[in-house]
């Protein structure tokens, strides 16, 4: 589908909604809204182990993380065992991963599906929404937007 067909989040230019998510996997911290206003811009990636396009974007997330971009993950309607298998197989670019087990945070963010990625400013303001999987050609644009937000 054309990206213009997707519904954009109403939160662009707004602070991230208040939330606190438990860890999605053992050994990795969960995620709270306060973690997204820590003075550094970062990407927030909604994903699911069951999501085929999430697997396809894994190399691009790895490339962004290797370039120094902090990426936090939100595992959507998933269980810890499947999230762990996904990370073991496709890589783990995430600094933290929160478990959105019932999809409530996805609704609060205005996300229309997975994968979906947001650029969050150092003060916790949502700057950009990338709908769908990040493709190789999207990496330079996201990297530039992240650097501009610093």
Q: Residue spans of the language-model regions?
A:
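A short beta-strand-turn-helix
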Residues: 19-43
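A generic structural signal for alpha->beta connector loops
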Residues: 18, 68, 94-95
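N-terminal targeting signals for export/organelle localization
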Residues: 1-22, 150
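Structural microenvironment flanking redox-active thiols in thiol-disulfide oxidoreductases
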Residues: 55-91, 100-107
């Amino acid at each position: 589908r054309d990206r213009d067909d997707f519904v954009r989040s109403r939160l662009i230019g707004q602070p991230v909604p208040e939330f606190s998510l438990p860890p999605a996997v053992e050994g990795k911290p969960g995620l709270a809204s306060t973690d997204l206003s820590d003075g550094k811009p970062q990407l927030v990636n909604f994903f699911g182990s069951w999501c085929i396009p999430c697997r396809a974007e894994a190399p691009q997330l790895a490339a962004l993380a290797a370039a120094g971009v902090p990426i936090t993950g939100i595992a959507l309607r998933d269980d810890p065992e499947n999230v762990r298998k996904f990370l073991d197989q496709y890589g783990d670019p995430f600094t933290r991963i929160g478990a959105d087990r019932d999809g409530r945070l996805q609704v609060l963010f205005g996300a229309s599906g997975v994968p979906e990625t947001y650029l969050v400013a150092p003060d916790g303001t949502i700057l950009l929404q990338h709908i769908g999987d990040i493709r190789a050609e999207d990496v330079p644009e996201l990297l530039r937007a992240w650097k501009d937000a610093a």
